[in-house]
Amino acid sequence: MKSTLKKLLPFAVVGVISGATTVGGLQYFGHNSSNGDQSYFTTAAPNTSFAGMNTGAVGDDFVKAAKTTVPAVVTIKNYQSRTASRASEQDLFDFFFGDPFGGRGQQRQKQQQAPENMPSGMGSGVIISPDGYIISNNHVVAGANKLEVVLSNKKSYIATLVGTDPNTDISLLKIEEKGLPYLNFANSDNIDVGQWVLAVGNPLGLNSTVTAGIVSAKGRGIGILGSQGKATNPIESFIQTDAAINPGNSGGALVNTNGELIGINSAIQSTTGYYQGYGFAVPANLARKIVEDIKKFGIVQRGFLGVQSLDLSNDQLVTSYNKQFKTTLKVGSGIYITGFGENSGAEDAGLKKGDVITKVDNYDITDFADLSMSIGSKRPGDKVQVTYVRNGKEGTTSVTLRDQKGGTSTRTKADLSVTEKIGAEFDPLTERFKTEYGLNSGVVAKNVSEGSEMAKIGIVDNYIIIEVNGKPVNSQKDVEKTLEKYQGNVQVKFVDDYGRIYTKGFKMP
């Protein structure tokens, strides 16, 4: 079963998912840690310049852009509750077979669980409005129980996490202040390969660092959001730059020489974890759409074509597909439709298996990154013109995008199910498991979403939930029934993978 699933996974891409192969050495770079590496600083030879370049004009542009950008880029400190990394063997014995010390074991367990609030990491963020909205990366804020924002003038604030989107690695924070310096979004569709850009952030603890480079490529899919993040339907169409980017730059600004925001720095390609030539930024148009959704609806609105597909530009995938399905597809450009998901808008619009998508609206589709960007910036109910090739002939059809449940209207947080609101699903424990470990109730957490309420209190996949608000739960329906109309603080009693029992809470969204 596993081998069959593994073979099919590269081709069974439902909706719009980046299908690029993962580039070796790709890493997020949001969290700083002290290290003992020596730093070497060199000075360029006098009167050295690039041949044929008006260095004075470019330098003036850099200065203006830096003066605009630096005050609007902040440091974000991520604080998390730290607990003992492992439970002792006695803890496991106490939990499953009772406490032989008459309560002393339980007291010892509580002492080990006592959290220490301390900074876990640091990243960057960009102020995008004078009233304190800040955009950053999802991985910069993930797991935080407190977020501190430090401005370039060293003034500090405790931030509210407004929302996150692991599928694009974007988060939105808010601090209570007025009259803040901020950056305007540029139209990232209009950037050109080769144009000058500045990366501004707080790498390696060096606040307000500005580096320069060019746009090295556009529409780059690198496979990092699905492999290192918790994205279920990742959208990867990164701006690639050779501006120096290092740990701590995550969530910082990539700007043009006018000081306008063209991207949010997110990842680097490196074998060491430090700058080796290339960084990747989420395009401003996509980032802006995500934060607008979060502000307006409380959640991100995602439209889907509803196709299973193959990236014809990927030599490895095409070769594997041909071998497995005895086909003779040729490597080229475009997206080959291999099938359809449930409630597919593309299928209802007349697209068929074997069609090759070549354009969405006026956007040329050469690979998955192009398709994910063109659809990922849309909402359910939006219509797109899809150009395709069938049996050598070109056709066009209008597709109404749908959400993953087949709906064509936008939803707010109030429309979400209980499991969507708290960010997890649940499977029942088997009776054999309950009997073996002496449990009267319990469900197993699965598909815990990054940044969700369940994730914030430390629950991950495969943790056992025993009670919700003091009530035993044995199924997902039990959880939903307990919280369906509930407003207020939720108390969750759960067991981690070392057998330690916790009771933690969150406010029902």
Give the residues covered by each predicted segment.
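Extracytoplasmic/secreted envelope proteins and their assembly/folding machinery
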Residues: G59-A66, V70-P71, E89-D94, G98, ...
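Short, surface-exposed secondary-structure boundary micro-motifs
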Residues: N78-Y79, H139, W196, N202-P203, ...
